[in-house]
């Protein structure tokens, strides 16, 4: 089923992008705090 591949990619992006965003925010806050 090709839909499964598309769903897996969409789910991976849906989880990956917010994680990167949070890591970038945390890095900015950490560098500012120190």
Curated annotation (Swiss-Prot):
Q: Which NCBIfam families match?
A: PS_II_psbM
**Complex and partners:** PSII is composed of 1 copy each of membrane proteins PsbA, PsbB, PsbC, PsbD, PsbE, PsbF, PsbH, PsbI, PsbJ, PsbK, PsbL, PsbM, PsbT, PsbX, PsbY, PsbZ, Psb30/Ycf12, peripheral proteins PsbO, CyanoQ (PsbQ), PsbU, PsbV and a large number of cofactors. It forms dimeric complexes.
Report the domain of life of the source organism.
Bacteria
Question: What transmembrane ranges does the database entry give?
Answer: 6-26
Q: Does the record carry Ribosomal protein as a key word?
A: no
Query: What's the source species for this entry?
Result: Acaryochloris marina (strain MBIC 11017)
Query: Per its database record, what is this protein's job?
Result: One of the components of the core complex of photosystem II (PSII). PSII is a light-driven water:plastoquinone oxidoreductase that uses light energy to abstract electrons from H(2)O, generating O(2) and a proton gradient subsequently used for ATP formation. It consists of a core antenna complex that captures photons, and an electron transfer chain that converts photonic excitation into a charge separation. This subunit is found at the monomer-monomer interface.
Query: Membrane topology type, per the record?
Result: Single-pass membrane protein
Family per similarity comment = Belongs to the PsbM family.
Q: Where in the cell is it found?
A: Cellular thylakoid membrane
Instruction: State the encoding gene.
Output: psbM
Q: Which UniProt keywords apply?
A: Membrane, Photosynthesis, Photosystem II, Reaction center, Thylakoid, Transmembrane, Transmembrane helix
Q: Name one GO biological process term.
A: photosynthesis, light reaction
This one is known as Photosystem II reaction center protein M
Q: Which GO terms describe its cellular component?
A: photosystem II; plasma membrane-derived thylakoid membrane
């Amino acid at each position: 089923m090709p839909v499964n591949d598309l769903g897996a990619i969409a789910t991976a992006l849906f989880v990956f992008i917010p994680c990167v965003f949070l890591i970038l925010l945390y890095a900015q806050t950490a560098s500012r705090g120190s």
